[in-house]
Structure formats: structure tokens, C-alpha cells
Swiss-Prot record:
GO molecular-function terms, A-Z: ribulose-bisphosphate carboxylase activity
Keyword rRNA processing: no
UniProt protein name: Ribulose bisphosphate carboxylase small subunit 2
Keyword Membrane: no
Anything else known: The basic functional RuBisCO is composed of a large chain homodimer in a 'head-to-tail' conformation. In form I RuBisCO this homodimer is arranged in a barrel-like tetramer with the small subunits forming a tetrameric 'cap' on each end of the 'barrel'.
Complex and partners: Heterohexadecamer of 8 large and 8 small subunits.
Classification of source organism: Bacteria, Pseudomonadati, Pseudomonadota, Acidithiobacillia, Acidithiobacillales
Record HAMAP family: RuBisCO_S_bact
Family affiliation: Belongs to the RuBisCO small chain family.
Annotated organism of origin: Acidithiobacillus ferrooxidans (Thiobacillus ferrooxidans)
Length: 118
């Protein structure tokens, strides 16, 4: 029987923190982020940009940047809003969320900018 490995992420070590599903993979390139946003658009989900302080990243509440972009289908517009949010809140984590109207829940979300860890 093999031994169970310890989970290496610790709250006391901010560099080890993981966020969202894709955080266990290598960092996404700009093109890969673009593909993820294109997927959100292709599913008909409503994109939104959210941000929070690194110390609150594990909480359920992230601040919404403006309103959700209802019906937005231009990937560049969505990415520019995420960039504007990051420039306005440079120390915060910024994520893009795809809201699924049919299931009335988040279809997906991914952190596109990581803030400065404490």
C-alpha cells in the first residue's frame, strides 16, 4: 500500500496557495487565457470580472468589477476589462467568471492576475 502524501499548500506560506481549478497546472499563457475566455463566450455564458485582496482569496466574496458583461461576445473587450481592473487594483487577485444563465450558477472562473501575496 502506498503512503498518502501531505497536501503541500499552507495558509502560512502564501507562495503555496492554490486558486480555482486551473491553479494546479502551470501558469496559463496569454493565448491560453484568451482560449478560456473564448470558451466562456462560445457557451453563451455572461462574463464578469471580480477581484479581491490576496488575504481574502479563500473567502466566498470577491468584489465585482463593474456589472457582468451581459451578452458580451468580444473576447478582447472582456480581456481589456480584466486588465483595467488589474491596473486599478494592482495588489489584488483578478479573475474572470462565466455565469451560466440556464443553471443559474458559475460555469467557470479563472484567476488571470495574481496580486502580491502577504
Amino acid at each position: 500500500m502506498s503512503e498518502v502524501q501531505d497536501y503541500k499548500s499552507r495558509l502560512s506560506d502564501p507562495a503555496s496557495a492554490k486558486f480555482e481549478t486551473l491553479s494546479y497546472l502551470p501558469a496559463l499563457t496569454a493565448d491560453e487565457i484568451r482560449q478560456q475566455v473564448a470558451y466562456i463566450v462560445s457557451k453563451g455564458w455572461n462574463p464578469a470580472v471580480e477581484h479581491t485582496e490576496p488575504e481574502n482569496a479563500f473567502g466566498n466574496y470577491w468584489y465585482m468589477w463593474k456589472l457582468p458583461m451581459f451578452g458580451e461576445t468580444d473576447v478582447d473587450t472582456i480581456l481589456k476589462e480584466a486588465e483595467r481592473c488589474h491596473k486599478r487594483n494592482p495588489h489584488n487577485h483578478v479573475r474572470i467568471v462565466g455565469y451560466d444563465n440556464f443553471k443559474q450558477s458559475q460555469g467557470t472562473s479563472l484567476v488571470v492576475y495574481r496580486g502580491k501575496t502577504v
